[in-house]
């Protein structure tokens, strides 16, 4: 079972919050106290809350649920993509486009356009165009890939969001709330935990902390997918 210990979190600097003057009072229950002008997060709270979140992620993945990893901060972009690919899930790591969930119909059309352009680039269509037209289509394809590449195979709305930085990704959180999609999020001391179903109080800036959250989440999803595959195999075996 995917689990994270207190030692793991201390080594990754999960307990370092923001400067005290930037705090959100709603985070008070999860703060141990100030140290040198910085709020220290109470890991006695974070450890069980994160492990509870991991159990739920495993359950969702075990029911063949789709997990969308969201993290567009510079410190998170590469790690978010790597974690999602590691567990064969989906990601948004460049910029959250307003309506990405709530206006899925339009997003689906853009994904269709992206796939169409990819086909054109591979089947020789681009070679038949003028240099200028080929360049314009290549740029359009690259722009769409940057925004939608991580969700182009999602095939519908996700069953959960795993968010690095609830504050930074507040639009994504709000859209998920509107659609009743559960939100798992790292919530720092300057953030608002409202709208987050599974609050994980922790540092949302440090690369090592971000890596810890994502590695554990990916492991939890893989565990769920494995359980799902084993259940299917047993079902087929019994049917035979």
Swiss-Prot record:
Disulfide bonds: none
Pfam families (alphabetical): Ribosomal_S2
Alphabetic keyword roster: Ribonucleoprotein, Ribosomal protein
Protein name according to UniProt: Small ribosomal subunit protein uS2
A single GO cellular-component term on record: cytosolic small ribosomal subunit
Gene3D superfamilies xrefs: Glucose-6-phosphate isomerase like protein, domain 1, Helix hairpin bin
Record-linked SUPFAM superfamilies: Ribosomal protein S2
Spans traversing the lipid bilayer: none
Keyword Nucleotide-binding applies: no
